[in-house]
Amino acid sequence: MNVGSILNDEPSPSKKTTNDDSGDSVRPDMSTYQRHSLVNLLNDPAPNNELKTKETKKDWSEDEHSNFRVPVTEPNQQLSPVLRRSSIADITNEKDVDISSSTEHPIEQDKSEKDEDELTRISKLKSTNKPRRYTEPPIWAQEWIPTSYQGTANGTPVVNAQESSLSSKRVFDRSSTVNVDLECSITGVIPPPSVTRTIAEWIYANFTEIPDDQRKYVELELKFGTIIDKRAGHRIDINVSTECIFTDNSNTYFDMGVHEVGWNDMCKFLDDLEKSYQDELRRSPQANSNSPKRKFNILESDITDNFYQITSRNEQPKSIRISKDNLLDPPRYTAINKQRLSSLFIHNPSSMYDLRLSLSYENPIADNNIDGIIKKNQPTLTRIKKRNSWTHRPTVTRFDMTRVLSPRESKNKSGKKIVEQDQSFEVELEVDTLELFNGFDKFKSGADSIRFEELVEIFVNNARCLNNRVTKLANK
């Protein structure tokens, strides 16, 4: 006698009926809810109404695919489905799917309400949790804004309407070296030169003060000369041997100009670069078919500048420069009001000359006001400039090599007035401010954090090339 027989209240083997040897004895029909084994113990107890239904059944038909008997009901009679859990699979049936018919009963819970509850819970979690990033950077991480621009909408840069004509390809590869067995640094990045970084920061700080509508009038130029100590009367000596930024402007001044020998040698240096470029084009025309025909765009000019000091009521005095183009007949007059914004001295004791980086406004004067200024005022200074300009587009630089004649009046022994011409030589490098402002905007917007400093380094490198050239000449 097994456990199933005990649970089903079967009689002991001694109480069984005879005819065992025939094997044809039939047991009475058992309800589908009788517990035949331990597995059936897992099933729910049979409802009373289902047991009563069995008594009202009329006909039975035998299923052709199984030994179970399927009850046949009346056409209009419907039986409630009975879910049986006869296996572990049925027990873990979370959706209450009838295995025999594979039908799924609808879930009473409204899914839309459940989704809304989930969204509400997620929104609450987002509002209570700490954000991953600051909506506003802490004070130590915020960008410095000048006092004049605080409280304005200058935080978002306005990109210049005129796009750059240069590509965004990197000029200086600061992450690799030529030799495969060497690395540029322990971090894999070459640190920027300290002098170049300081110059770029100085330009950046001044550019933030310039309104967008005034950008087209900005001029940024490097001039060759020497930093003179006012007390000693000669070039400064601050016990340094390399290039540096000199900030003590109170006791010094910048003596602009170069020697004639050095000026001629720098002009020859630019001419030699142009000749070498032309020779390279002739040697390999096919390889350089897409290259420009000239390395530099060279322009000669002959300009006479007259400076006027204009004073108006309730206004500060203005220095007006009226330029006369002597190469045109009749000559053409243009006038500007030049205002210097800031200057930076770059001292290099190992080179022949120092540099002064000047940032200025060049506001144009209307042509109809020029005649009135000339007739009503006397010039305070006259300069005749015979200039050769080399414009090198790939380095966004224009080289101005100028021979300046300054008329000087004097009297001879007999008292007769004599006009003499003092001659001087000047070297200026002017950067394309449009390209520099484009790099400035890209840096502020985060689109390109390298372009701005890269342009500054290119510009300063051009000045270093000329300075090194004339220094070699002096050391011979």
UniProtKB/Swiss-Prot annotation:
Its EC number is 3.6.1.74. GO terms for biological process: 7-methylguanosine mRNA capping. It catalyses: a 5'-end triphospho-ribonucleoside in mRNA + H2O = a 5'-end diphospho-ribonucleoside in mRNA + phosphate + H(+). Residues 123-132 have a biased composition (Basic residues). Keywords: Hydrolase, mRNA capping, mRNA processing, Nucleus. One of its GO terms (molecular function) is polynucleotide 5'-phosphatase activity. Residues 51-67, 105-114 have a biased composition (Basic and acidic residues). Its main location: nucleus. The keyword Nucleus applies. SUPFAM superfamilies: CYTH-like phosphatases. Pfam families: mRNA_triPase (PF02940). It is found in: Nucleus. InterPro entries: Cet1/Ctl1, CYTH-like_dom_sf, mRNA_triPase_Cet1, mRNA_triPase_Cet1_sf. One of its GO terms (cellular component) is mRNA capping enzyme complex. Residues 1-133 are annotated as: Disordered. PANTHER family: POLYNUCLEOTIDE 5'-TRIPHOSPHATASE CTL1-RELATED, POLYNUCLEOTIDE 5'-TRIPHOSPHATASE-RELATED. Belongs to the fungal TPase family. Heterodimer. The mRNA-capping enzyme is composed of two separate chains alpha and beta, respectively a mRNA guanylyltransferase and an mRNA 5'-triphosphate monophosphatase. First step of mRNA capping. Converts the 5'-triphosphate end of a nascent mRNA chain into a diphosphate end. This is mRNA-capping enzyme subunit beta. The gene is CET1.
